[in-house]
Amino acid sequence: MAVLLVALCVFQTRSAQSSSATTSQAVPKPLLLEKNEGERRIWREPPPGDFILKVSPINNGSQHLVMGTEDITPGDEFPTHKHLGQDEIIYIEKGAVRVHLGDQERDLHAGGTVFIPAYTWVSVKNAGTEAVSVVFVFSAPGFENYMRCDSVLPNEKVTPLSPQEQKACGREGHVIYKDFEDNPKK
């Protein structure tokens, strides 16, 4: 967890130093959240699953970081994709995952960390028999827009997106899925 906190500080400092002057941004509000608190959302595509966005421009005005949590059921995965302009850290809280990162492949367990530089292909699969819990942190806002686009709130009806809508979500969230053109996500 110390690695995650250090990375958060580094990302925030680097983002603050490298960002150009912006006009009248909202001041981020501090948050204290329990494990299940935040913006809970349900993925549109099978297999069903949910995630919680905790820190984002919409949730608390954060201009430099996005953070959330997600559980991955056995056999499920984050398909091969890359983020355009955002680094990401995934911290494995519980369980075991198989990670393909660039030209590397490795199994990681609870306490493991994945650092994903922007523009690097990555996939993460639950390689075990129990649910995996992860914490994800992005160095800049953007991908949470994709996550919202491809999900619904718990009280909303889950409806699938067309391939064109999926592509639009990807553009909005600064992400490219490896097989997106021929084979939309999931």
Predicted regions and their residues:
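A short, N-terminal "cap"/entry segment at the start of jelly-roll beta-barrel domains
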Residues: 11-65, 152-186
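Extracytoplasmic
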Residues: 64-67, 87
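Bacterial N-terminal signal peptides
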Residues: 2-9
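Ligand-binding loop in jelly-roll beta-barrel domains
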Residues: 61, 98, 118-145
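Conserved short histidine dyad/triad with adjacent acidic residue
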Residues: 51-53, 68-83
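Glycine- and acidic-residue-biased ligand/ion/polar-headgroup-sensing regions
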Residues: 85-97, 102
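Short acidic-glycine-tyrosine-enriched beta hairpin
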Residues: 103-119
